[in-house]
Amino acid sequence: TGRKVLLCERMEKPQRKVRITGKGRCNLTNLCSEEEFLSKVRSGADFVRYAWQQFDSRAVMQFFEQIGVPLSVERGRRVFPTSGRAWDVAEAHIAWCRQQGVEIITHTRVEELHTRNKQISGITVRYNDGSTEQIACQTAILATGGASYPATGSTGDGYRLAHQLGHTIVPIRPSLTPLIADRPTPKPLIDFTLRNIAAQLYIDGKKAAEEFGELTFTPLGVGGAIVLRLSRQAVDALIDERKVELRLDLKPALTAKQLEARVEREKNALSAKTPLRQLLAKLVPSVMIAELARRSQLD
């Protein structure tokens, strides 16, 4: 378009968060339908709908493949770089920006936005050596991230700068976050991942949401893809001081009757003197047996 574009990056290189997202693999997008995608948006769906219609997941795939990032579609219609490296996505994107004439300056923090007649007129930046400079511009795009990961540059500057311009800032709260349980995780379970399970979120005793996929036990609670997807609702409820429970279904493909029948078959295949722990070993991961037996007071 002939516009001169300057990208001010606070860190030593752009896209620090992209490089670590998706466990370092970078889940770029998802090939679900528009309605399915928007059904996952907790608030502001109309705003997201407009953005989606301008640049949907197919457009995302086409863009990255055109700039040299081969993509693969995995289980759950998730799209990843074929290399499995988030680094490749970041570097290709930066290279493309430079090819388009974008000037990128690093170690540069935007401290203030200036206006004239209610229009953006410039910015003040602070460089790594402590010096400052005012740069004239006609447009400023705030792309600062939130306040969730200061080590990547997300320290909440965007909220402060938007507030300077008179925008209303709603209270921020965690989202896409692991959850802390009411008791520490038993050591044998730490870093253990359950796959192909269901997690049901209950708020004040009522089922609020359910997700399927992977869950990982952390030292203080649970994480993993399904927990991240449920965390927004859980956090909102916790802030409102409501009771929050997470219930796990290790066999979501089976109905209660089917599971009961399987337990009966496994039990009948064992002798009467076989410890119940041996029966559990046929139904749940071995690393969970000791804790399940202890909590259920089984021998």
Labelled PLM ranges:
Residues 106-120:
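A conserved short coil-to-beta-strand element within the FAD-binding core of flavoproteins
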Residues 128-139, 210-213:
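Core beta-strand elements of the Rossmann-like FAD/NAD(P) dinucleotide-binding domain
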